[in-house]
From Swiss-Prot:
Compartments (UniProt record): Nucleus
This protein's UniProt keywords: Nucleus, Transcription, Transcription regulation
Gene: ADF1
Phylogenetic placement of the source organism: Eukaryota, Fungi, Dikarya, Ascomycota, Saccharomycotina
Keyword Metal-binding set for record: no
The name this protein goes by in its record: Antisense of depressing factor protein 1
Species of provenance: Saccharomyces cerevisiae (strain ATCC 204508 / S288c)
């Protein structure tokens, strides 16, 4: 019979340009051992953590935990008032310092600003 004039797909000059071909590489024995040791180490640490976490969860009461973590509105209001007083004291001290410096400059220079 005659020759087929159909070209195979992918046969040409620029086929596969820019495409990286990933080669399958086998995992080395050292890498296997290292990974196995890491997995065993993580399993061992999780095995020791689980019983302690279960014990802690069963001993504490949920209502008690909630009371410890919530902020009390009265305490917040008191703290805000205390903070505002402290800020006001800082402002007054700053203004006193500025006035004192201004007076000193006026005394040194001999005229008022």
């Amino acid at each position: 019979m005659g020759k087929c004039s159909m070209k195979k797909k992918g046969v040409g000059k620029n086929v596969g340009v820019g495409k990286k071909v990933q080669k399958k590489r086998s995992i080395s024995t050292a890498e296997r051992k290292r990974t196995k040791l890491q997995v065993e180490k993580l399993n061992k640490s999780s095995e020791t953590m689980i019983p302690t976490l279960l014990r802690e969860a069963s001993t504490q009461e949920p209502a008690k935990l909630k009371a410890e973590t919530t902020l009390k509105a009265e305490e917040l209001i008191k703290d805000q008032e205390k903070d505002s007083k402290v800020r006001e004291q800082i402002r007054t001290e700053k203004s006193k310092t500025n006035d004192s410096m201004l007076k000193q400059i006026e005394m040194i220079s001999g005229f008022s600003l």
